[in-house]
C-alpha cells in the first residue's frame, strides 16, 4: 500500500505542476476580461435568475441544476481540503482560494453557457451536454472530445469518490467509534439505491439538501467568528502576509500557498473542470447565459461561503499546523492531529462541546451524499456520450462508481486525496484549454443575452444564429420560459 501511495503522489505532482496552476489563473483572468467581469457586474441578475421559477418537462429546472452543482461542489474539498491547504500552504492558501473563486467564476460562466448551447436531447426526453459536446461541435475535434469524456468518467466515476467516503468514515470513527469498513458499506448501499434513479430524482434530493447543509455549516462558522471576533484582524493579517511571502514564519512557502490555494480552490468549486457544465446542460432554460450566470454564483456559495467558513473555524480556534515542503512543522498547535476533517471536528468540539463532533458527522453525510450523487451523474453523462446511451454501459459505470466509493473506506487518506487530485487535474487540463479556445462564442452568447434584456425581453436562444446545429431539437421549445 505504501508503494501505491508513493506512485499516486508522484502522478499527482506531475499533473498538478505549476504550469496547471498558472493556466487556471491565467485563463480565468483572460475570460473575466473578455466578458467584462460578468461575475461582478451581473451579480444582481444571478440572484434574480436563481429565484425565477422556470418549469421544465424535458429537463431539470435551473434552480435544481444550481442545487445539484452546489451539492456536488460542496463536499470534502470545502472542509478537509481547505484544512489540508492550510497545512501544506499556510493561511495564505486561503487568499489564493479566494482569487481562484473570483476569477474562476468567469470560467464557470463560459463552460456552463457552452454546455447549454451545445446540449442534445436524448430519446428519453432529457438533456445531455458538457465539455465533450462543445469540444466536438464547437471545436469540431472528435478525438479531443472523446479524450475529455474518458477523463471525465475516470475522474468523477473512479478517482474522486474515495475522497468523500474516506472523510466520512474518518469523522464517523472519531465521533461514534464505529468500524470504517461498516460505515463505508452502508454508505455505498444507500448510494446504490439513489444512483439508480434518474437525474430528476437526484436533482430533487439535491434541491432539498444543498441549501440546508450549507446554512447549518455557515451558522456554526458565524458563531465561532462571533466568539473569537477579537482574533479576526490578526488572522486576516496572517492570511495576506502568508499569501505574499512577507510573514516572518511562513515567507518561505509562498509558492506552496499559491499552488495549494489554487489546487484546493479548484477541488472545492470545480471552476474550469467542466463538472458544472455537465449538470447545467441538463437544465431547461430559454438562454444558455442564464445557466452560465447561475453556475457562476454557485462558485461564490462554494468557496467564498463554505470554504471560508472552514478556514475561519480552524484558524480562529487555533486548530491548525503548517508544514514546509520537507514536512518540518513551521507552526504546531494541534498536538500532532492529522490534518483534514479532524481539524474541523476538533475545532467545533473545542467551541461547542463533544456533541458538535457528532453533529458534524451528520452534516458530513449530507455533504458527501450530494457530492457523490453529483459525481455519479457527471460520470454517467460521459459514458452515455462515449457509448451512444448504452444502458449496459451505464449500469457497468454505476457499478464501477460504487466500487470506487467503497475503496475510500479501505485505502489510506494520503493515497485517496492524491487520486482525487489526479482526477480533478486531468479534467482541468482538458477543459481549461477548450473554454479558452471557445471564448469568442461565449462572448457572443453573453452579448446576445444582454441585448435582449435591454429590449425588455425574456432572452430566447436561437442556435442557428450562432452557427450551432440543433439536430436533436434541444432548443425547440413549446413555450417561452
Regions found by a protein language model. Name each.
Residues 103-111, 185-199, 210-230, 263-266, ...:
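Selective recognition of specific alpha-helical transmembrane segments in multi-pass small-molecule
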Residues 32, 111-119, 222-238, 246, ...:
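Extracellular/periplasmic helix-exit of transmembrane alpha-helices
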Residues 56-88, 114-132, 136, 143, ...:
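Alpha-helical membrane segments and immediately flanking helix-loop junctions
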Residues 3-4, 35-39, 78-82, 91, ...:
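Transmembrane helix-loop junctions in multi-pass membrane proteins
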Residues 37-62, 84-86, 90-91, 98, ...:
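Flexible loop linkers connecting adjacent transmembrane helices
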